[in-house]
Protein backbone atom coordinates (compact mmCIF):
# COMPACT_ATOMS: atom_id res chain seq x y z
CA UNK A 1 0.00 0.00 0.00
CA UNK A 2 2.89 2.30 0.60
CA UNK A 3 3.93 2.11 -3.03
CA UNK A 4 0.36 2.73 -4.20
CA UNK A 5 -0.10 5.70 -1.91
CA UNK A 6 3.28 7.08 -2.94
CA UNK A 7 2.36 6.98 -6.65
CA UNK A 8 -1.22 8.17 -6.34
CA UNK A 9 -2.30 11.77 -5.89
CA UNK A 10 -4.13 12.62 -2.76
CA UNK A 11 -7.59 14.18 -3.35
CA UNK A 12 -6.67 17.27 -1.33
CA UNK A 13 -3.55 17.75 -3.43
CA UNK A 14 -5.65 17.38 -6.55
CA UNK A 15 -8.11 20.04 -5.31
CA UNK A 16 -5.31 22.43 -4.38
CA UNK A 17 -3.62 21.94 -7.74
CA UNK A 18 -6.89 22.44 -9.60
CA UNK A 19 -7.70 25.62 -7.66
CA UNK A 20 -4.23 27.06 -8.09
CA UNK A 21 -3.99 26.21 -11.76
CA UNK A 22 -7.35 27.79 -12.56
CA UNK A 23 -6.38 30.90 -10.59
CA UNK A 24 -3.04 31.01 -12.37
CA UNK A 25 -4.75 30.70 -15.73
CA UNK A 26 -7.08 33.58 -14.97
CA UNK A 27 -4.17 35.66 -13.66
CA UNK A 28 -2.17 34.88 -16.80
CA UNK A 29 -5.15 35.84 -18.96
CA UNK A 30 -5.62 39.10 -17.05
CA UNK A 31 -1.93 39.93 -17.42
CA UNK A 32 -2.14 39.17 -21.11
CA UNK A 33 -5.13 41.49 -21.51
CA UNK A 34 -3.33 44.20 -19.56
CA UNK A 35 -0.30 43.92 -21.83
CA UNK A 36 -2.48 44.21 -24.93
CA UNK A 37 -4.26 47.18 -23.41
CA UNK A 38 -0.95 48.79 -22.49
CA UNK A 39 0.34 48.31 -26.03
CA UNK A 40 -2.78 49.95 -27.45
CA UNK A 41 -2.48 52.86 -25.01
CA UNK A 42 1.18 53.38 -25.88
CA UNK A 43 0.35 53.33 -29.57
CA UNK A 44 -2.45 55.88 -29.08
CA UNK A 45 -0.27 58.13 -26.91
CA UNK A 46 2.51 58.06 -29.52
CA UNK A 47 0.05 59.00 -32.26
CA UNK A 48 -1.27 61.90 -30.18
CA UNK A 49 2.25 63.04 -29.29
CA UNK A 50 3.35 62.97 -32.94
CA UNK A 51 0.23 64.83 -34.01
CA UNK A 52 0.78 67.55 -31.39
CA UNK A 53 4.46 67.81 -32.33
CA UNK A 54 3.61 68.25 -36.02
CA UNK A 55 1.03 70.90 -35.21
CA UNK A 56 3.45 72.70 -32.91
CA UNK A 57 6.19 72.61 -35.52
CA UNK A 58 3.89 73.97 -38.21
CA UNK A 59 2.68 76.78 -35.96
CA UNK A 60 6.06 77.92 -34.73
CA UNK A 61 8.44 77.39 -37.60
CA UNK A 62 11.26 79.89 -37.50
CA UNK A 63 11.07 80.48 -41.24
CA UNK A 64 7.50 81.65 -40.94
CA UNK A 65 8.56 84.20 -38.33
CA UNK A 66 11.60 85.56 -40.18
CA UNK A 67 9.62 87.78 -42.55
CA UNK A 68 7.45 89.42 -39.85
CA UNK A 69 10.51 89.91 -37.62
CA UNK A 70 12.42 91.56 -40.48
CA UNK A 71 9.43 93.78 -41.25
CA UNK A 72 9.15 94.75 -37.58
CA UNK A 73 12.86 95.64 -37.49
CA UNK A 74 12.47 97.78 -40.62
CA UNK A 75 9.45 99.57 -39.16
CA UNK A 76 11.36 100.17 -35.91
CA UNK A 77 14.23 101.76 -37.87
CA UNK A 78 11.80 103.95 -39.80
CA UNK A 79 10.07 105.02 -36.59
CA UNK A 80 13.43 105.89 -35.01
CA UNK A 81 14.43 107.93 -38.09
CA UNK A 82 11.11 109.76 -38.05
CA UNK A 83 11.54 110.50 -34.32
CA UNK A 84 14.99 111.98 -34.97
CA UNK A 85 13.66 114.12 -37.84
CA UNK A 86 10.78 115.29 -35.68
CA UNK A 87 13.17 116.23 -32.87
CA UNK A 88 15.37 118.18 -35.34
CA UNK A 89 12.35 120.00 -36.79
CA UNK A 90 11.08 120.80 -33.31
CA UNK A 91 14.48 122.20 -32.35
CA UNK A 92 14.70 124.31 -35.53
CA UNK A 93 11.17 125.57 -34.99
CA UNK A 94 11.93 126.60 -31.44
CA UNK A 95 15.10 128.41 -32.63
CA UNK A 96 13.14 130.24 -35.31
CA UNK A 97 10.49 131.19 -32.78
CA UNK A 98 13.19 132.61 -30.46
CA UNK A 99 14.71 134.62 -33.33
CA UNK A 100 11.32 136.09 -34.21
CA UNK A 101 10.74 137.02 -30.58
CA UNK A 102 14.12 138.77 -30.45
CA UNK A 103 13.40 140.81 -33.58
From Swiss-Prot:
Keywords of this protein's UniProt record, alphabetized?
A: Coiled coil, Endosome, Transport
The protein depicted here goes by the name: Biogenesis of lysosome-related organelles complex 1 subunit SNN1
Listed under GO biological process in this entry are: endosome organization; regulation of protein localization
Coiled coil (residue ranges): 69-102
What is its subcellular localisation? Answer: Endosome
Listed under subunit, the entry gives:
Component of the biogenesis of lysosome-related organelles complex-1 (BLOC-1).
Per the record, the domain of life is: Eukaryota
User: What's the main place this protein lives?
Assistant: other
Signal sequence segment: none
- What does it do? Component of the biogenesis of lysosome-related organelles complex-1 (BLOC-1), a complex involved in endosomal cargo sorting.
**Membership in a protein family:** Belongs to the SNAPIN family.
Q: Which GO terms describe its cellular component?
A: BLOC-1 complex; endosome
User: What organism is recorded for this protein?
Assistant: Vanderwaltozyma polyspora (strain ATCC 22028 / DSM 70294 / BCRC 21397 / CBS 2163 / NBRC 10782 / NRRL Y-8283 / UCD 57-17)
The residue ranges crossing the membrane are none
